């Protein structure tokens, strides 16, 4: 199972999403939608071995976490508007501490970014923080240490990043920094590159 945990610093936390202005009044909700599309959609199929979390810290009720489970998703299309509609449906619900299903494969909860990461750590999963100063991903996932049958979690942030406090938290729990490029990349592009690296590692 491959999991991504994405920190959306400005994305709103209620259902008042303006589908005509996802980057603006919706708090860069376009970034969340692009990440969902990159996490799951193949040309004619879905990645069913993937889970994606988006943790929103925008107004008015942060934090709110949304979970997308690839093996359960139905009726979602890869375009931003379709994904935003499903996010809107989730955010229209009142989030509780426990995950509550909004539509097939999409859940909402009142959870912190750190809390979700810590849950994964306590489950024994390997935590990787996507950062340009980390170790090259192809050195980590190769013939000797491939991704098959592993439970792997990747942490990434939006255009703002995850912040110094969360970086320190990741360091404290032993997360390994992984680099995809010496350049700063868009989060959705990072997800595509990660999938590609893991796909190749599984075939070696």
UniProtKB/Swiss-Prot annotation:
Q: How does it assemble?
A: Homodimer.
| KW Ribonucleoprotein (keyword) present | no
Q: Which family does it belong to?
A: Belongs to the methyltransferase superfamily. TrmY family.
This chain belongs to the protein called: tRNA (pseudouridine(54)-N(1))-methyltransferase
Positions contributing to S-adenosyl-L-methionine binding: 130, 157, 180-185, 190
Q: Tell me, in one coarse class, where this protein mainly resides.
A: cytoplasm
Which SUPFAM superfamilies does the record cross-reference, listed alphabetically? alpha/beta knot (SSF75217)
Q: What is its EC number?
A: 2.1.1.257
Show the GO MF annotations: S-adenosylmethionine-dependent methyltransferase activity; tRNA methyltransferase activity
Superkingdom: Archaea
Which terms are listed as keywords in the entry? Answer: Cytoplasm, Methyltransferase, S-adenosyl-L-methionine, Transferase, tRNA processing
Catalytic activity reads: pseudouridine(54) in tRNA + S-adenosyl-L-methionine = N(1)-methylpseudouridine(54) in tRNA + S-adenosyl-L-homocysteine + H(+)
């Amino acid at each position: 199972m491959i999991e991504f945990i994405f920190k959306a610093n400005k994305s709103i936390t209620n259902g008042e999403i303006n589908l005509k202005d996802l980057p603006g009044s919706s708090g860069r909700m376009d970034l969340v939608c692009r990440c969902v599309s990159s996490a799951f959609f193949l040309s004619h199929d879905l990645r069913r071995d993937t889970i994606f979390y988006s943790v929103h810290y925008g107004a008015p009720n942060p934090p709110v976490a949304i979970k997308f489970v690839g093996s359960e998703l139905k009726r979602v299309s890869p375009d931003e508007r379709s994904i935003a509609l499903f996010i809107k449906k989730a955010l229209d619900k009142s989030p509780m501490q426990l995950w509550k299903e909004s539509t097939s494969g999409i859940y909402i909860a009142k959870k912190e970014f750190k809390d979700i990461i810590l849950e994964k750590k306590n489950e024994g999963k390997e935590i990787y923080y996507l950062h340009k100063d980390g170790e090259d991903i192809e050195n980590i996932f190769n013939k000797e240490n491939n991704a098959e049958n592993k439970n792997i979690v990747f942490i990434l942030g939006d255009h703002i990043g995850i912040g110094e406090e969360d970086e320190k938290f990741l360091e404290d729990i032993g997360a390994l920094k992984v680099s995809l490029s010496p350049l700063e990349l868009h989060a959705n592009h990072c997800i595509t590159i990660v999938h590609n690296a893991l796909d190749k590692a599984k075939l070696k």
